Every structure is written in C-alpha cells, then in structure tokens.
Amino acid sequence: SNGRHLLWESEKNKLWNAANTLQGNAYVDVSFLRDFTFSLKGNISLRNIEDSQYGNAEIGAYKDTGFISKIDQEYKEYTLQQLLAWKHQFGRHFVEWMVGHENYDYKLNFDAIQKKNESFPGIDELSNFTTTTYSEGYKDTYRTEGHFTRARYDYNETYFAEASFRRDGSSIFHTDHRWGNFWSVG
C-alpha cells in the first residue's frame, strides 16, 4: 500500500486562502472667480491575499515529513489628479485652458515559504516544521507622474483649434531616460 486514504487525507490536510480588498474613489470640483474650476480626483485600492497549505505527516503525499506552505501578498495602489481649468466665452469666440498634474503609485510586498519535517502532528504553524525547502520575498514599486496642459479655441462652433503638451515620468526607466515629452496640435 502507498499509504493513501483520500477521506482521511482530506480530513487531516488543510488548504486555506483569504483575500481582503478595499477600494475607494473621491472627487471634488470647486468653481471660483467666474470662469475657473479646480478638480481633485483620487482612487485607492488595497488588497491582501493569504494562501496556506498544510499536508500532514501521517498519511498521504507528505507521509513521514509533513508539509506547510504560506504565501502573503499585499498590494497598494493609488492615483491622484489635480486639474485647473479656465473657460470663457467672448461673443462668438470660446477659449478653454487647462493645466494638470497626475501621479500613480503601486507597491507589492510578496512573501512565500515552504517547510517540511513536522515536529508535532496536526499543528499547522510554520514554527512546527524544522526544514525550510523554499523561501522568497520581494518588494515591487512602480510610479508614474505627469504634468500637462491643453488650450482650445472655437469660433462660432465652426472653426476649432487645439494644442496640448504633456511631460510624463515613469520609475520603470533609468533616471537618464525617465521623462518624456508629448505634444499635439490640431
């Protein structure tokens, strides 16, 4: 016999995971001095994920040694945007100008560990296992930031012109090449 008994194994082994997520969005628009509007927008996402697996040392695939595995992942990300806009009508002429700033931030913390050689049967805690077979942990961060402006003009809702400029930076690139400029005219 290979020591397998599915019902008994299912009763003794444990597989567990949990996830928590919190998300939120907020914005406010404030109008002032007749033609100005300031807008503030933001969102946030927080996530935690935990996975655990326990294999008993009495019967089944982990007979004689036992097995435990734990993985923890924590994510945090947010975006913030600030805009200042000015709009004005001069007879048949309409002019709009906007300037803004936006930033994004992402962070991940990841930890994983696997151990074997269970000391006391049925205790599914890392401290109850003596030999680490796998261990990994890392942090990842990614950020972007942008500054931008746009001007629009229209005459009598017939002729239109627009120009925009944007300067964006990303943490994924080397500091010598982190920022880029983008523009359009039409």
Placement of each model-derived feature along the sequence:
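Surface-exposed loop/turn segments flanking beta-strands in extracellular/periplasmic regions
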Residues: 1-8, 53-68, 109-136
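Solvent-exposed loop/turn segments connecting transmembrane beta-strands
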Residues: 171-177
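Feature captures outer-membrane beta-barrel proteins of Gram-negative bacteria and organelles
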Residues: 180-186
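Outer-membrane beta-barrel transmembrane strands
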Residues: 7-45, 49-53, 69-89, 96, ...
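Extended hydrophobic secondary-structure segments that form protein cores and membrane-embedded regions
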Residues: 96-102
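N-terminal active-site segment of His-dependent metallophosphoesterases
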Residues: 105
